[in-house]
Every structure is written in structure tokens, then in C-alpha cells.
Amino acid sequence: MSRIGKKPVDLPAGVSASVSGQTIEIKGPKGTRAFKATDDVTLTVEDNVVTVTPRGKSKRARQQWGMSRTMVANLVTGVSEGFKKELEIQGVGYRAAMTGNTLKLNLGLSHDVDYTPPAGVTVTAPKQTEIVVEGIDEQLVGQVAANIRQWRKPEPYKGKGIRYKGEFVFRKEGKKK
């Protein structure tokens, strides 16, 4: 039995769901998202509650049961509240600024890095050393944050680079004389 799959997904006020075949469409104040489940599970919507049930007792059906329930829960969270990743920049001269829709990063390279986020994701730089990535698709928000972090990962000696807010960077001791 899947402990996650057994839990029903409650729809908050202002969020509606409709099922057609194996596809569930969730509409909310921030937008609309859809998810196509595999044939191993059944999706039902009753009284503002989405339930996912397996169609058999196979291992794959049980795996898809929990995963499908989590995907539906993430869709509901995305269209009602949205997802947010915060990044910090540490290092002398490292900074970020928004120019129109493009994020301009000065990271100690010989050139500035210009990053244009994909559709559905909003990137802002409230301070020179902070970057906020927001959107309704959790996977896309995480991927955009990872792509930005990829330009200058935190290094272990001085801790310079782009890191997630609250991320711990293991520090190493330098060379000894």
C-alpha cells in the first residue's frame, strides 16, 4: 500500500479539476496545468477532492499510484500558490541585474552572462546578490534555478558562487605552509 497514494488531494477555494480519460486538468488563479497519468491508475474528482487509485496489484501500478498522486498535488500547489526558488550570490564583484526580461550576471568571467528564462517562469533580482525564480511548474522552476546556478557553483575554499538560499557549502582548509 502506498502511504502517499492513499491520501486524497484537497482542492482549495478557487481551484477546479476536470478529468477526461487519463488526463487531469487543474485550473486556478495562477493558471492552468494538465497531467496525463499512465493506464496503471484511475483519477477521480468528487466534492473538491482528487483521489488516485491503482488499477491492479502489480509493482508498476503501486509505483505509479504514489507518483501520480504527488504530481496532482504539485499541480494544485502550482496553480494556487506557485513555486519559488531563491538563489544567493557570494563573491567580490559578483552581481545580478534584470535588463528587461533578461537576467544579466557578472560572475568574474571575461564576459557578462545573459540568461533569458523560458515562458512560464519569472526571474527577478530584488538585490544585486539575490535572484528569485517563480512559476507554476515545479520542475521548470527548479531547472531554471539549476541552470542559473550552473554558471558559477559555490566553491569549497572561499565559498564564492551562486547557491540556493540556505544551502550549506562544505568549506575546505587551504594549503598549509
Curated annotation (Swiss-Prot):
InterPro entries with a match to the protein in the record: Ribosomal_uL6-like, Ribosomal_uL6-like_a/b-dom_sf, Ribosomal_uL6_a/b-dom, Ribosomal_uL6_bac-type, Ribosomal_uL6_CS
One family name in Pfam for this protein: Ribosomal_L6
Keyword RNA-binding applies: yes
Cellular compartments per GO CC: cytosolic large ribosomal subunit
Quaternary structure note: Part of the 50S ribosomal subunit.
Family that this chain belongs to: Belongs to the universal ribosomal protein uL6 family.
The name this protein goes by in its record: Large ribosomal subunit protein uL6
Gene coding for it: rplF
